[in-house]
From Swiss-Prot:
NCBIfam families: lanti_MRSA_kill (TIGR03898), plantaricin (NF000539). Kills a number of Gram-positive bacteria. Acts at the level of cell wall biosynthesis by interfering with bacterial peptidoglycan biosynthesis. Specifically inhibits the conversion of the lipid II intermediate into polymeric nascent glycan strands by transglycosylation. May interact with the peptidoglycan precursor rather than with the enzyme. Transmembrane segments: none annotated. There is a cross-link at T52-C60, T61-C66 (Beta-methyllanthionine (Thr-Cys)). Keywords: Antibiotic, Antimicrobial, Bacteriocin, D-amino acid, Lantibiotic, Thioether bond. The modification 2,3-didehydroalanine (Ser) is found at S64. This is Lantibiotic mersacidin. The gene is mrsA. Residues 1-28 are annotated as: Disordered.
């Protein structure tokens, strides 16, 4: 696929429908919907670090002010 065709498929949804499919195939055809429902929310999120301010709020910034 040429660069122009790739860019056209990004911008134009009709062109995207007519372009070649994903080389890996359709990932949703391998799993049944019931199997995918079991995957959603399958794990608990556990924070590695919890930082709270004296007022009860938590703040972390890009400058690493809340290093654990």
């Amino acid at each position: 696929m040429s660069q122009e065709a790739i860019i056209r498929s990004w911008k134009d949804p009709f062109s995207r429908e007519n372009s070649t499919q994903n080389p890996a195939g359709n990932p949703f055809s391998e799993l049944k919907e019931a199997q995918m429902d079991k995957l959603v929310g399958a794990g608990d999120m556990e924070a590695a670090c919890t930082f709270t301010l004296p007022g009860g709020g938590g703040v972390c910034t890009l400058t690493s002010e809340c290093i654990c």
